[in-house]
A protein has these predicted regions:
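Walker B catalytic acidic pair
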Residues: 213
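Active-site-proximal or metal-binding-adjacent scaffold patches in catalytic folds
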Residues: 1-208, 217-259
Length: 259
């Protein structure tokens, strides 16, 4: 049996993540799908975000199995890609060019002023960036990340005291991340992770996610008892869940474009 045939049929599980691309004819165009062999994956998975399509293979899945999975889901893939292409995102920010800054469900006008150090502040006119003459794209991405992290922590700090009574304990730590699909999570040690994209959208939706994760301190599951705890603290949670179904992809796409 040739080496290629062995790889196609029963590849040796890799110790690290491996990436390549596979081309797929889809409707009237040929697209590239990122193929990722991940030792942590348990099943074949096809996903789509603003960067394109991704096929994840577990260690013992063959390339043939992956390509067959792509063929079986080509109609679904075409629909998902059309949805992402139709998203109305603000123009990407460029150093020194006026634009808009997404924050708490609004698009704030953003202006630039010369300064010694990169700094972003909010005032009555919108956002204002103090910008050094040698600032570049990396400086802007770092500035935006620091800004959104500070705004996210400010919101959590404002809401958290209201919900602490009745909880067995406070979260042990707060981590802010760029999450691909989740909005938040609570680890067994009590540390909470939240998606930075939350601060771009509706504050009520963000507050719901915070309450959702806090309730996992009481019920580490999604049982009826868990949803009862959520209902007691945030009765409008269904409306906010619907909001994420409508706007979630757009929020995550905006964050990735910004950072």
């Amino acid at each position: 049996m040739s080496r290629l045939l062995r790889r196609l049929i029963s590849p040796t599980p890799p110790a690290t993540v491996q990436r390549d691309t596979v081309r797929l004819r889809l409707e009237d165009a040929e697209i590239e799908v990122l193929r990722v062999r991940d030792p942590r994956a348990r099943r074949i998975k096809l996903s789509v975000d603003e960067r394109g399509a991704r096929l994840t293979l577990p260690p013992r899945a063959s390339l043939v199995m992956g390509e067959r999975f792509l063929e079986q889901h080509r109609d679904w893939l075409a629909v998902q890609l059309r949805q992402y292409q139709g998203q109305d995102l603000p123009a990407a920010l460029q150093p020194g060019v006026e634009g808009v800054l997404p924050l708490r469900g609004e698009l704030l006008p953003l202006r630039w002023q010369e300064g010694r150090f990169a700094r972003l502040e909010i005032d009555e006119h919108g956002g204002c960036v103090q910008w050094p003459t040698r600032g570049g794209d990396a400086t802007l991405r770092r500035l935006l990340r620091e800004f959104y992290e500070a705004q996210t922590r400010a919101d959590v700090g404002r809401w958290l005291p209201k919900y602490l009574p009745g909880l067995p304990r406070a979260p042990s730590r707060l981590r802010l991340k760029v999450m691909s699909s989740q909005w938040g999570s609570l680890a067994p040690d009590g540390s909470m992770a939240l998606d930075l994209a939350l601060v771009l959208g509706s504050p009520q939706a963000f507050e719901y996610v915070l309450v959702h994760e806090l309730c996992h301190l009481i019920q580490p599951n999604h049982s009826p008892a868990f949803w009862h705890e959520v209902e007691q603290r945030f009765p409008a949670w269904r409306e906010q869940r619907d909001y994420f179904q409508r706007e979630g992809r757009r929020l995550k796409a905006m964050l990735r474009q910004l950072l």
